[in-house]
């Protein structure tokens, strides 16, 4: 497995070394690289070469060739805020209400057990003799 990692590192290093310019090369002319795109009138050559491939079924091809270059740049798609159809929030509310109901039942059972325990204090003989034991505790 180690040879695979070494091979990957070698490929990355060699690609980085081959992408770097030679030390004795002339500096790049950034003005030439950043030059503006072709004029709108010169886009006719692209339309004529693509007509054979797409034919008359592609009216968008002519529309793109006739649009000015500035109108195609800088438009971000507007994100519409649609109402959410997620059930996460209602489910979390239901979970919370269920846990509160469970806690309420546990507290009620503990209170009843404590009440029964406190009713039995000082009445040790009641639980052993059936004749003296009342039918229900309140």
UniProtKB/Swiss-Prot annotation:
Alphabetic keyword roster: Amidation, Cleavage on pair of basic residues, Hormone, Secreted, Signal
Domain of life: Eukaryota
Pfam family, one: CRF
InterPro entries: Corticotropin-releasing_fac_CS, CRF
Residues with Isoleucine amide modification: 121
Entry-linked SMART domains: CRF
PROSITE patterns attached to this UniProt entry: CRF
Signal peptide annotation: 1-19
Gene Ontology BP terms: body fluid secretion
Record's subcellular location: Secreted
GO CC terms of this entry: extracellular region
Chain coiled-coil ranges: none
Chief site of localization: secreted
Residues making up the propeptide: 20-78, 125-138
Any GO MF annotation of the entry: diuretic hormone activity
Family that this chain belongs to: Belongs to the sauvagine/corticotropin-releasing factor/urotensin I family.
Function of the molecule: Regulation of fluid secretion.
The protein's name: Diuretic hormone 1
């Amino acid at each position: 497995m180690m040879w695979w990692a070494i091979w990957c590192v070698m490929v990355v290093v060699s690609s980085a070394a081959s992408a770097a310019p030679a030390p004795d090369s002339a500096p790049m002319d950034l003005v030439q690289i950043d030059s503006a795109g072709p004029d709108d009138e010169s886009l006719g050559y692209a339309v004529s070469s693509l007509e054979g491939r797409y034919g008359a079924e592609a009216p968008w091809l002519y529309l793109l060739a006739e649009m000015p270059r500035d109108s195609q740049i800088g438009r971000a798609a507007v994100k519409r805020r649609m109402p959410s159809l997620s059930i996460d929030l209602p489910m979390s509310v239901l979970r919370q209400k269920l846990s509160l109901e469970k806690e309420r039942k546990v507290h009620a059972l503990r209170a009843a057990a404590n009440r029964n325990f406190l009713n039995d204090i000082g009445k040790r003989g009641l639980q052993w003799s059936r004749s003296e034991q009342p039918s229900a505790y309140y």
